[in-house]
Amino acid sequence: MQVSRVLAALCGMLLCASGLFAASGDFCDSSLCLNGGTCLTGQDNDIYCLCPEGFTGLVCNETERGPCSPNPCYNDAKCLVTLDTQRGDIFTEYICQCPVGYSGIHCETETNYYNLDGEYMFTTAVPNTAVPTPAPTPDLSNNLASRCSTQLGMEGGAIADSQISASSVYMGFMGLQRWGPELARLYRTGIVNAWTASNYDSKPWIQVNLLRKMRVSGVMTQGASRAGRAEYLKTFKVAYSLDGRKFEFIQDESGGDKEFLGNLDNNSLKVNMFNPTLEAQYIKLYPVSCHRGCTLRFELLGCELHGCSEPLGLKNNTIPDSQMSASSSYKTWNLRAFGWYPHLGRLDNQGKINAWTAQSNSAKEWLQVDLGTQRQVTGIITQGARDFGHIQYVASYKVAHSDDGVQWTVYEEQGSSKVFQGNLDNNSHKKNIFEKPFMARYVRVLPVSWHNRITLRLELLGC
C-alpha cells in the first residue's frame, strides 16, 4: 500500500512537471541541452534549456565550480574558460589547450603518422625548445605514407544517427530512458548519454555504416555512468565488412579472434589501433566482458582509401585569415565589432561570434578559401552556428574551384552541377566527399538553401 502511494506521488510529480514544461513552450531536440536538461522553444523559436539541479549555463553545461571543474580535457591538457559568457554555439564555455603531440577538441588524439598498413612511424609535433630528431619524411605525393588517424564522425556528427545500429537497447526508468545506439558518441553528455545493450542480450553488438569503403585504423572507447554507477566494456572484439552481410573478425597472432582491452572506468579514454588497418564500410564492436552493463561511447579513426583526406588548414589556422574572403559579411546591430567575417568561418571555431554569415540571404553569396598553392581537394566538412541563440546554417550548397581566382568551375557529377546536403543544426559536422577529386588553389562554397541566415564554418579535405 505504501509503495503504491509513493508511485502515485511520483507519477503526479512527473505529470505536473510535464504540464509546466508544456506551458513554457514546445519541446525541441534534447541533445541541444547538456546534462539531462529539457529543451524548449519560446514564442520566437528561441531555444531555452531547463537545467536539472546542480547545473546552470545556457545549455546546462556549467556546475557551481565552472565548466573546467572537473577538468574535461585529456592528456594533461589545460582547460581555459572563455571570456565570453554567451557563445555562438552549444559547446561548453571552455577550450582545451593541448600539449605537444595531441589534438582534438579535448586533446584526446595523439598526432602520430601511420603508414598505410597502420604501423607507427613518428610523432609529427616537436616542442619548439627541443632539437628535432631526424625522421623519414612521408612522401604524400606518392602515397607511400599517410596520416590515417582522423576521427570519422561519431563525436562530431559526420556519422548520422541513421548509420548507427545495435542488436538491442536498454530501456531504463520505467521505460522512459532509451539508451540507443545513436547516443554512443564519444564525450556525449547528459543523463542518458551512451548505448547500453539489453540485459537479456547474450551476444550484443553495435554497428556503424560508413556509407563507403574506407580505411579504418583504430577505435577510441569510453564508458558512461548509469543510475550513478560506472558501466563500461572491459574487453571487446571488432568485426568488419564490405557489404554488411559477411563479417570478419580482426585476428590475433595465433589466428583467433582478437580481444581488445577496453576501459577501466566510465569516463577515461582508451585508444586501440588496428595493425594492419582495415578496408571496410561496416564496423561492428562486440562486447565480450562488461562492468555492470555493456555501455559504450566511441569514435572510429581512419581516412579515405586514397589516403588524401587530411584537413587542409582552416580549423588549425594554417590557412591565414587573409586567404579567406566572401561576397559579403553580416554585422549584428550593424556594428563592425560584431561582424561575422569570412576568416571566422573555420570548423569548430568558438566564441560569441564564431562563423561567417552573409549580409543577405541570396544564392549569389559565397565563401572563398585560397589554399596558397594548388592542392588536391577530396572533401569538405561544414557546420552552422548560433547568433545569440538563433540557430543558423547552410542546408545545401554547391562547390566551385579555380586555379587563378577568376575563371571558376562548378563541381559536377553525372553531367550536372552537384548540390551537396548541408547541415541540419548549428553544431554537427556534415562531411561530403567528392567522387571526382579536383586540383585547385581556390575553392568557393555557394549556398543554395539555408535556415534563418546563411551561416557557415568549414574545413576542406585533401593533400
Curated annotation (Swiss-Prot):
Entry membrane topology: Peripheral membrane protein
Protein name: Lactadherin
Modification after translation (UniProt): N-glycosylated. Isoform 1 also exists in both an O-glycosylated and a non-O-glycosylated form.
GO terms of biological process kind: angiogenesis; apoptotic cell clearance; cell adhesion; phagocytosis, engulfment; phagocytosis, recognition; positive regulation of phagocytosis; single fertilization
Entry GO MF terms: integrin binding; phosphatidylethanolamine binding; phosphatidylserine binding
Leader sequence segment: 1-22
Triggers of expression: Isoform 1 is induced by insulin, prolactin and hydrocortisone in mammary epithelial cells. Expression of isoform 2 is repressed by the same treatment.
One matching Pfam family: EGF
Keyword Signal: yes
Role this protein plays: Contributes to phagocytic removal of apoptotic cells in many tissues. Specific ligand for the alpha-v/beta-3 and alpha-v/beta-5 receptors. Also binds to phosphatidylserine-enriched cell surfaces in a receptor-independent manner. Zona pellucida-binding protein which may play a role in gamete interaction. Plays an important role in the maintenance of intestinal epithelial homeostasis and the promotion of mucosal healing. Promotes VEGF-dependent neovascularization.
Superkingdom field: Eukaryota
Glycosylation sites: 61, 266, 316, 426
Cell compartments where the protein resides: Membrane; Secreted; Cytoplasmic vesicle, Secretory vesicle, Acrosome membrane
Domain EGF-like: 24-61, 64-108
Keyword Calcium (UniProt): no
Tissue expression from the record: Mammary epithelial cell surfaces and spermatozoan. Isoform 2 is present in brain, heart, kidney and spleen and at low levels in lung, liver, small intestine and testis.
All residue ranges annotated as the F5/8 type C domain in the record: 148-303, 308-463
Gene name in the database record: Mfge8
UniProtKB keywords: Angiogenesis, Cell adhesion, Cytoplasmic vesicle, Disulfide bond, EGF-like domain, Fertilization, Glycoprotein, Membrane, Repeat, Secreted, Signal
